[in-house]
Amino acid sequence: MRGMTGDHIGHSLRRLEDQRFLTGRGHYVDDFAVPGQLHGIVLRSPHGHALIERIDTAAARAMPGVSGVFTAADLDSDGIGALPCIAQVATVVPMIVPPRRALARDRVRHVGDPVVFVVADTAPQARDAAEAVAVEYRPMPAVVDAREALAARAPLLWDEAPGNLSYRFERGDKGAVDAAFAKAAHILEIELVNNRLVVAPIEPRAAIGTYDAAAGSFDLLLTGQGVHSLRRQLAEAVFHMPLERITVRAPDVGGGFGVKNFLYPSGCWCCGRRGGWASPSNGSPSAARSSSAPHRAATIIRGRAWH
């Protein structure tokens, strides 16, 4: 810790960082505001699995203060890439990684899947406009049990992943293990169920993106636990631009527990290519914030597992 010298092993140490937080002097993303800042609200899927039949944004675009209403078509026209998968864990055959985009195209695959991003002068205006967006869905069969998802006739979630299997992970010597079981006098079996888990930090995720038209660069302020990795993912996979043209900053983080290590779509929404998502006319900064309930619906979770 800063300002401490000497041998501290085996001794109680006085923490140096707590006073600032306990006296309300912490600075979180929601404490920041940029002149001319716009506000973004995302409309999410209420279905676990459905086809997107139609999106009507006309009423939302006509509402007061609305700067833009964006769908997956805007991702395509701006050349915004899919969010990368950083957990390459397959050991048997190459891992199948379907493209996870910042806004769903044609199909939603989980409750909370982002579909439309609305930008307006104020957060209430953006929220009202999001409610005016009309999305027609055709519900599809869905499963919530991983074992059922691997069944022969289970509904297919991704065309790229036959049988809903992304990867197989194995470690150790299977032959030696089989031989040990063959020699064992007794074999005991037990099923362990690891329940669904949702990480719930006090501070939900938030992001503020600023575009510098003169330099052609982005500045992204977010609730993150690994700015260097997030910056590299945005540059290489999402915006396809030189690393030095993207700055990612994280102020104080109100709890993370690992869930804020990942790149979420909010970074794409708040920046967008050439500042077009923030404002088609002047590249105004854009902010997207989540309350606790949407945070749970839009955060990486650990599903129920069987061992």
Enumerate the language-model features and the residues they cover:
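Conserved beta-alpha junction segments in alpha/beta enzyme cores
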Residues: A176-V238
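Phosphate/diphosphate-binding loops
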Residues: P114, D121-T122, A278-H307
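Flexible, low-hydrophobicity surface segments
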Residues: M1-S166, I190, G276
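Acidic, glycine-rich active-site loops and adjacent beta-strand->loop/helix elements
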Residues: L75-D76, G224-V227, P251-G256, P285-S292
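Short glycine-rich loop/turn motifs
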Residues: L38, A104-R105, E203-I208, I300-I301
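Beta-strand segments within the central parallel beta-sheet cores of soluble alpha/beta enzyme folds
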Residues: A72, E244-P251, A278-A288
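Thiamine diphosphate
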Residues: G256-W277, N282-S284
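Short acidic, glycine/serine/threonine-rich loops at helix termini
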Residues: I80-P84, A129-A132, R231-L234, F257-L263, ...
